[in-house]
């Protein structure tokens, strides 16, 4: 399982979410994807807004997603 975190350098909420991610301890790997640098990948996952988190199972199938900033506690719950 892994999480793709779609964001952009100009996105203030993305920076807020990254700060929260940096402050947690999780066994789930979180890969950052810049929508400006990897627009095709963002289109592949139908990202309509940032920040967007997409959780994938081991086969690459989407399990769930979240659009917007989460609190630390909500993020930890979402990662379960």
Residue spans of the language-model regions?
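Local sequence-structure signature of Cys/Sec-based thiol-disulfide redox active-site neighborhoods
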Residues: 1-24
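Mobile acidic interaction elements
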Residues: 12-13, 22, 39, 45, ...
């Amino acid at each position: 399982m892994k999480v793709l975190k779609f964001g952009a350098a100009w996105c203030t909420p993305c920076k807020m979410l990254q700060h929260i991610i940096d402050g947690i301890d999780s066994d789930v790997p979180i890969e950052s994807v810049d929508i400006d640098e990897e627009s095709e990948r963002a289109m592949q996952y139908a990202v309509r807004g940032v920040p967007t988190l997409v959780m994938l199972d081991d086969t690459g199938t989407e399990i769930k997603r979240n659009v917007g900033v989460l609190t630390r506690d909500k993020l930890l719950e979402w990662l379960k």
